[in-house]
Design a protein with these regions (language model features):
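Acidic, Mg2+-coordinating catalytic module of metal-dependent nucleases/exonucleases
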Residues: 128, 132-190
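Conserved DEDDh/DEDDy metal-dependent 3′-5′ exonuclease domain
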Residues: 40-122
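Conserved RNase H-like, two-metal-ion catalytic cores of nucleic-acid enzymes
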Residues: 1-69
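Acidic active-site catalytic centers that drive phospho-/nucleotidyl reactions
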Residues: 7-9, 110, 163
Length: 191
């Protein structure tokens, strides 16, 4: 089983387009994937420092072909809240219709959905990686569209890549240890 963590960032916010139900109106700025060894970033803007990071840089247009190839090889997609956010946006905003195949075949793992089903509570990725691995996100997701508009593409791409690595490491930790840790805001205790 080949697991590929995926994350995307947008140029706009949900309130700019009338809410999360309008996934076709999101403008994707960058998508990152991480398989535990190799990172690939899909972006159409020029990158300065990130291009020298050792990760692969491809155009956003190449993403649909790479995802379709991954699906055909039996690969799974991994992400935090990907069923409600990333997958619909990729399908509806970027016309990446192979996403329908992933959903229909259930070839994806959504860490947010799994934890909600088990605990009845949503845990932000920031909470999970801090409590489980003592790691951190590079920024809040709401900052990414603002930085993108300011032309700070490298920072947004680096943030997106780091999130894929964090989700992958969190998933791997859960696989290896049988649990992940979080702080329950509702109950005021660690889980």
């Amino acid at each position: 089983m080949s697991m590929l963590a995926i994350d995307l960032e947008t140029k706009n916010m949900s309130f700019d387009i009338g809410g999360f139900g309008n996934t076709h109106m999101f403008q994707v700025s960058t998508v990152a994937t991480w398989d535990g060894t190799t990172g690939t970033v899909y972006v159409d803007e020029p990158l300065d420092s990130f291009a020298k990071s050792g990760h692969i840089v491809k155009s956003l247009g190449q993403l649909k072909y790479d995802l379709d190839e991954h699906f055909e090889k039996g690969g799974l997609l991994l992400g935090h809240n990907i069923k409600a956010f990333d997958l619909p946006i990729l399908r509806d905003s970027m016309d990446i219709y192979c996403i329908n195949k992933y959903v229909k075949a259930e070839q994806f793992v959504d860490t947010s959905k799994i934890l909600f089903k088990e605990h009845g509570e949503r845990f932000p990725l920031k909470n999970l990686v801090k409590c489980t691995m003592n790691d951190f996100k590079l920024m809040d997701s709401a900052d990414a569209p603002k930085l993108w508009k300011m032309g700070q593409y490298d920072e947004v791409v680096e943030y997106c890549m780091k999130d894929t690595q964090l989700v992958y490491d969190l998933w791997k930790y859960g696989q290896d240890n049988g649990f992940v840790k979080a702080f329950s805001i509702e109950k005021g205790e660690h889980k």
